Amino acid sequence: MTSQYSNYSCPLNNIQVNVIGSSRTSDDHFLEQMLTKRKKTNISQDLHYTLLGLNPRDLYQISIKLARIDEKKYKFNGNFNGGDYYPHKNSEIPMEDTEEIVHLDGYQTGARWMKTGVYFPKIGISKEQPDKERCLLLESLHAYVPVLRFTTSSGISLEVTVWSQKFVTTMTSSNRSVKRREKRKLEETTGPSAKKTPEVIEFTQEAVVPEVYNAQQVYQMQNDTMISSDSKFCSPLAFQQDFTEEFGTISQLDAYVNVNVQSCSSSSLSSPAALQQDSTVSSDNDFDDKNSEEFDAVFEYIDQQFSNHDQNPMDQQSKSIDLNQTTWTSQSINNQSYLSTASSPAALNQDSFASEKSSIVRDKKNDENCLDEFDRVFNELDQQFTPTENQLQDLSNCTTWNQEPINNSIQSNQLNNNIAPALEENVEDDNAIFEHFFICN
């Protein structure tokens, strides 16, 4: 180690300082952290050194201070625990050494210092002016190196720099706040309590599709239009649907009427056994073929009336026109009305409204004729299936059939009255009770 007093011929020139517990040499250039806070914190590194080259008989006083290495300001890069720092930029703070802290042992001989070494315990550092003694004022993010001053009893002093031990100061509070801030940001973005940004719903304006004239749709609208507000039925097809919902299908109505006819016939009113036999026959759907044929003929006539009503001139015209292609059949070409209405969509639309009015009047007349025909048919059905006076008299005689079940119930009550005393007398003998019960039965 060189000294600033090397030009003087004194024994201080040969002093050597080594750090105890460290194998580092002066060629090492990495830094060790010294945490600084507003309050006093003790230096985490051991300030314990061995000394060589002192005069054993002379008295020496040893003190320590921290000096700036360079004019750079350092920046942390990498792991916080690793202490990876590098010079970042020039520092605006001038290079000044800290105050010296004198060892508590005072003046001691060179032999004693070389034997025990020198140790500075509980030296604190702070980034503000400390209120306590034995505390050094340091700047954050700057590099320092310890310097030992040897003072003899004659007043000669020598400073020895310990280059094998370098420090860089960092603020614990600032680094922890940065880590805390980063952790908070991570929780806000990925944690369960992360703030959810409202979703922006984009509305795209749909393109307006122009309507295309279609003659088939116009005719369908004509069939779905009601004849008038006072009319009971919209069309024969609608009437048939309502009739099916009200009375069921034709086969169900046929079966229901045949059951009633057979139950009211004079042949089935002769005795209760015959009535039970007729009910069994009706449950098996074995009906009279003659009545079923008459009902089939009636409803076939009704279906024929519906089919004749649905066929109108507009149906024939719509079949001869191909709506998907611009071609015309021979029937439409020979007809002058088609040539006049197919000139343009407007003309076709006008003719469709005219045909709509005529079809409404025609449908109204056909519906009136259809209703008259329905009245006539159902009157015939009522006359055909209305029971005669003889059948009604036979039905009144059916009340006498209830006497037989009453007599049977009286006999069963008498039987129970005969069994009850036997059960009370022979409770202990179970075999006698069962024997008496089977004999009575």
From Swiss-Prot:
Region (Disordered): 268-289
Biased composition (Polar residues): 273-284
A GO CC term assigned to this protein in UniProt: chromatin
Assigned keywords, A-Z: DNA-binding, Nucleus, Transcription, Transcription regulation
GO biological process, alphabetically ordered: cell fate specification; positive regulation of DNA-templated transcription; regulation of transcription by RNA polymerase II
Residues of the DNA-binding region: 18-199
Entry keyword Transcription: yes
PROSITE patterns, per database record: TBOX_2, TBOX_3
Subcellular location: Nucleus
GO MF term set: DNA-binding transcription factor activity, RNA polymerase II-specific; RNA polymerase II cis-regulatory region sequence-specific DNA binding
Superkingdom of source: Eukaryota
Protein name: Putative T-box protein 32
Organism: Caenorhabditis elegans
Lineage: Eukaryota, Metazoa, Ecdysozoa, Nematoda, Chromadorea
Gene name in the database record: tbx-32
